């Protein structure tokens, strides 16, 4: 049935005029270009860090996402206390926020917040392959797609931006290394670092402000004109300085003006409110890569203690019976 439909479509296409064929081909190219552009914009946020920094965690412990997301907000990370080698386990990432609030989008309009995170694992730990995941864990993960920070750093995972209302809590499926096959890994306690954000950043990687930021006056003087710019919003604020010069501060669509015409202002005085409602946070946890031989040794040790205690109790009862018999005699 499907083959017949395909043949019919091809036959109909061959009967079209050359002009119609060109129009269809043009629409096809336009659709592909649009999808590529949209997907590139959506996936751009993690790329900022990936392209600009070889390692997302600086020497002082700060995760580089904080360079663009200036406000501090809490995040939570939950992992098992210990895992055995070559074992699949899950990490729970929580990015809490009030889901009723709206953020300023790039076009100046209000919309829901998105979230994103970077998870820095110990060397050897990485994303668990899908064929190793139990069905229950697959359901918890859902449609989330985690990707390595780079081809050489599979122990660093990133995701985002994704809808915060759906994914403010994320389950990350992980697999532990096996020191028997990976000589760079030892049975030790390791740290895991998390960086998570909700909402858009206030700065771009080049240091320029986004429209999700506070805008200040660049000079001291009097506001002589406030001119709307474009259909999407934004303003040009004309300031006449004390020496008679004219300075124009541009405010993009999004932030709300808190100054008026003929108002006297000082340099660095806020011209707008701070529209940012999101923020970035860091958390860390520790996990022990447990040696199975140690676990077995501990179990044997505990069993030995239990048997020893049992024999002591039995011996005590035996002695008590002998003493009781001697007293009766």
UniProtKB/Swiss-Prot annotation:
Cofactor annotation comment: Binds 1 heme group covalently.
Keyword Protein transport: no
PROSITE patterns reported for this sequence: CYTF
Gene Ontology biological process terms, A to Z: photosynthesis
Residues annotated as signal peptide: 1-44
Ribosomal protein recorded as keyword: no
GO CC terms of this entry: chloroplast thylakoid membrane
UniProt subcellular location: Plastid, Chloroplast thylakoid membrane
TM region(s), chain numbering: 295-315
One of the Pfam families matching this protein, by short name: Apocytochr_F_N
Cofactor(s), by name: heme
Gene3D superfamilies: 2.40.50.100, Cytochrome f large domain, Single helix bin
SUPFAM superfamilies attached to this UniProt entry: Cytochrome f subunit of the cytochrome b6f complex, transmembrane anchor, Cytochrome f, large domain, Rudiment single hybrid motif
Principal place of residence: plastid
GO molecular function, one term: iron ion binding
Membrane topology: Single-pass membrane protein
Keywords: Chloroplast, Electron transport, Heme, Iron, Membrane, Metal-binding, Photosynthesis, Plastid, Signal, Thylakoid, Transmembrane, Transmembrane helix, Transport
Residues given in the record as heme binding sites: 45, 65, 68-69
Family (UniProt): Belongs to the cytochrome f family.
Function, as annotated: Component of the cytochrome b6-f complex, which mediates electron transfer between photosystem II (PSII) and photosystem I (PSI), cyclic electron flow around PSI, and state transitions.
Assembly: The 4 large subunits of the cytochrome b6-f complex are cytochrome b6, subunit IV (17 kDa polypeptide, petD), cytochrome f and the Rieske protein, while the 4 small subunits are PetG, PetL, PetM and PetN. The complex functions as a dimer.
Protein name according to UniProt: Cytochrome f
Organism: Tupiella akineta (Green alga)
